[in-house]
Design a protein with these regions (language model features):
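Conserved alpha-helical substructure of the radical SAM core
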Residues: 2-122
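Short, small/polar residue-rich loop motifs at catalytic or cofactor-binding pockets
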Residues: 250-255
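Radical SAM enzyme core and accessory elements
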Residues: 1-21, 263, 269, 274-288, ...
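Conserved C-terminal portion of the radical SAM core fold
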Residues: 69-75, 95-102, 123-127, 149-240
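Short glycine-enriched, charge-decorated loop/helix-capping segments at active-site entrances
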Residues: 45-52, 140-146, 210-214, 338
Length: 368
């Protein structure tokens, strides 16, 4: 059963919008490393290179093992999923196995025939990336200004086919605040369920681009202000890791939201592995990988892993003395790692309590 991670009482500190209740899981599968665009923020630094996951591996190993690991929902990602030569065959197998299927796409590589076939499968939804709402912003940020018109046109087709679920956006220095009003107007027009916005973070290509292309706090606050009014028009506004002035932080659902890399490596959470692969990380990525799904069953490893027994979040003096300590989930460990910190330190990008001191003494350490 899907469970919302967005609640009014806490800051939306996790990069995910939803998780899974009970003992189920959600899985994202990187079916290809390749992408026709070159986005400035790409978590996995995709481009016109890299591997596709073999269809045979997906059908014979990945999907059956995820099913046995109690995965209830699947999302295909990349790279750009629609450059995979077997994308439609993969979707058909997933549908036959009874899974709800999501696809995250830049909406530049999907044909009308594919849209029709996806609609016929049923229980498929599409999320489209819009990083701004002009060719000069979205297109430039994604390495191809002409891509914007194609993305808009294809998104309309997804909507007409009943496939469109959400629009995903990374506010950045190339975007104007007013573009997010236009983006939300477009979302309402085409019947999108939600618009999810999250900052340009220090993962993948963002390690180098964040300092020059990230939207500053004032712009993020302004974007929140101009988009909030669309709630009354039925649009769900999801402001991930926007500036937070007063709320306790959300927590971490690591192990419930897993990610299969194109080479079969299984991440306990994609973002924490993306963070561990940055130059500033204090952790090896293997600390957050649960083996290789091409080689072994992954359910037992996932069941045995308990992040919160290995690490203590909020293990620092500031959190310990905070009046919100009991209610606070301590934010996102991946964000802390991506900023060069240790798990247990303060998620400074989200913490609403002013920090008058220098870096806090590290208390939590990696488990042996």
């Amino acid at each position: 059963m899907r469970r919302s991670l967005i609640v009014d009482t806490h800051a939306s500190s996790c990069y995910f919008r939803t998780s899974i209740g009970g003992d189920g899981r959600k899985a994202l599968i990187q079916i290809t490393e390749r992408c026709n665009l070159h986005c400035a923020h790409c978590f996995v630094s995709s481009g016109d290179w890299g591997d596709h996951m073999r269809f045979e591996d997906i059908v014979e190993r990945v999907l059956p093992r995820l099913k046995r690991a109690r995965v209830e929902r699947l999302t295909l990602t990349g790279g750009e999923p629609f450059v995979h030569p077997a994308i439609m065959e993969i979707c058909a197998v997933v549908a036959d196995m009874g899974w709800p299927l999501g696809i995250c796409t830049n909406a530049t590589q999907t044909t009308d025939e594919q849209i029709g076939r996806l609609a016929a499968l049923g229980n498929v939804h599409i999320n489209v990336s819009f990083d701004g709402f002009r060719a000069e912003s979205h297109g430039k940020f994604r390495g191809n200004q002409a891509s914007f018109a194609t993305t808009v046109a294809t998104t309309r087709k997804f909507a007409e086919a009943g496939l469109l679920q959400g629009l995903l956006s990374t506010p950045n220095a190339l975007t104007e605040v007013e573009e997010f009003t236009a983006l939300c107007e477009f979302a309402v027009e085409v019947g999108a369920e939600y618009v999810l916005m999250n900052p340009l973070s220090s993962f993948g290509r963002g390690v180098k681009s964040q300092s020059r292309l990230a939207a500053d706090a004032d712009k993020m606050r302004a974007i929140r202000a101009v988009t909030e009014r669309f709630r009354e028009r039925g649009l769900d506004l999801v402001h991930i890791r926007f500036p937070n002035d007063e709320l306790p932080l959300g927590g971490c659902d690591i192990g419930k939201l897993i990610y299969v890399f194109v080479n079969g490596q299984l991440a306990l959470c994609p973002y924490i592995v993306f963070a561990a692969r940055t130059p500033q990380s204090k952790y090896p990525d293997t600390e957050f990988l649960a083996g290789n799904i091409f080689e072994d069953e992954v359910g037992p490893t996932l069941d045995a892993y308990d992040f919160h027994s290995r690490y203590t979040v909020g293990a620092n003096m500031k959190c310990g003395s905070c009046r919100m300590n009991g209610a606070c989930g301590k934010g996102c460990p991946a964000a802390i790692i991506a900023n060069g910190g240790y798990i247990g330190e303060v998620d400074r990008e989200q913490c609403p309590v002013p920090d008058g001191s220098k870096r806090l003494l590290q208390i939590g350490q990696p488990a042996a």
